[in-house]
Regions:
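Short, amphipathic alpha-helical "recognition" segments used to contact nucleic acids or chromatin
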Residues: 1-14, 61-70
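Alpha-helix C-capping/helix-to-loop hinge sites
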Residues: 7-10, 67, 86, 241-245
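Short alpha-helical "recognition helix" segments of helix-turn-helix
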Residues: 15-22, 79
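Structured, charged N-terminal subsegments at the starts of enzyme catalytic cores
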Residues: 19-36
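Basic, flexible linker segments flanking DNA-binding modules
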Residues: 31-128, 225, 282-288
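C-terminal domain-tail junction helix/linker
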Residues: 50, 211-213, 237-320
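RNase H-like DDE/DDD metal-dependent nuclease/strand-transfer catalytic core used by mobile genetic elements
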Residues: 89-93, 98-109, 116-145, 151-263
Length: 320
């Protein structure tokens, strides 16, 4: 505004529109600024008080460092919320980032950006399930793993290892997932079963099965794995984090997979769920969990302020 006023004083013969055109400023923006200036709401007139964050305590720093060394695949945000969920340290993600940077523990790979075209987001649990099969090699042969993922909560409703990928084996696995809904209210046509149109999902037997269980069959676009991107991403997570070696036998691999499923659902913070766990959204109260976490963060900040004030008072006392 001061620059415009000065230009009007130096060039009284030029009208306001010409001056604003030289500055590349729309006329509507100028009048909006003028109204805000009259009410003292321009940015250069607003005094924003500076606040200094209370630094973490040594105990909190040790907890973050040990957590980063123990969980090498967790990024700083997921690590921050995992420590909160375990009631070990209540630090903002940027504070965890600064600690990891200070101790040179930020060497985590950046994800490869990949545009995904997905169906409209689900707005309640069991509205839409994504399913797919992946192949695993161990015990000198190939096995198929089928997983069924709830789109709303990212909850792994069911997963198991199959000896064959025939339609009847897939139907039995889906039926086991549907059995978990016994006793719960289901809307007509739900859940919608989203798949990639593989040979297991296109035959007459599969269509009859979908009609019998009251679910809706949803086939994604051919040659477009991004349409089933939620489940494709889970497969990548399985490959990265589920420790099934080539020497494992079927019983051991099945036990490892079930244990990882419990960890994934109940303890692993999910970036798409504001770093809550899938179980919090699937059958829990995410609003209450977020409020509880925020309250713990505020309490931890107050405790840190008290800690450093005591350290300051003790240092002053030792000098006197």
């Amino acid at each position: 505004m001061a620059l415009i006023t000065r230009a009007q004083q130096l060039c009284p013969k030029r009208n306001l529109t010409a001056i604003l055109g030289d500055l590349g400023l729309p006329l509507a923006t100028y009048y909006r600024w003028q109204q805000r200036a009259q009410s003292q709401q321009l940015a250069d007139h607003i005094v924003i008080p500076s606040r200094t964050a209370v630094p973490p305590t040594p105990q909190e720093i040790d907890c973050v460092v040990q957590g980063a060394q123990r969980h090498l695949l967790l990024g700083y945000k997921r690590l921050a919320y995992a420590l909160m969920a375990e009631n070990k340290a209540f630090l903002r993600p940027w504070m965890v980032h600064d600690i990891l940077d200070q101790y040179q523990l930020l060497g985590r790979r950046a994800p490869v950006p990949e545009p995904l075209v997905r169906p409209a987001a689900a707005d309640h649990p069991d509205q839409r399930w994504h399913t797919d099969l992946s192949m695993w090699w161990f015990d000198d042969q190939w096995f198929w793993m089928i997983d069924i993922l709830d789109a709303y909560s990212r909850y792994l409703v069911h997963c198991e290892l199959l000896l064959t990928a025939r339609t009847d084996a897939v139907e039995r696995a889906v039926q086991r997932a549907l059995d978990t809904l016994v006793g719960r209210a289901r809307l007509a046509g739900e859940p919608q079963i989203v798949h990639d149109g593989g040979p297991q999902f296109i035959g007459h037997d599969w269509v009859q099965f979908m009609q019998a269980v009251g679910a809706t069959d949803v086939r994604t676009h051919p040659y477009h794995p991004q349409s089933n991107g939620l489940d494709e991403r889970v497969h990548r997570t399985f490959r990265e984090e589920m420790p099934i070696g080539a020497e494992a036998i079927l019983y051991e691999a099945q036990a490892t997979m079930l244990e990882y499923r419990r960890y994934y659902n109940d303890r692993r913070p999910h970036s798409a769920l504001r770093y809550l766990c899938p179980a919090d959204y699937y059958r829990g109260n995410p609003v209450a969990r977020l409020a509880e976490r925020e309250a713990k963060l505020r309490a931890a900040a107050l405790a840190r302020a008290v800690y450093w004030q005591q350290e300051k008072d003790q240092a002053a006392k030792s000098l006197s």
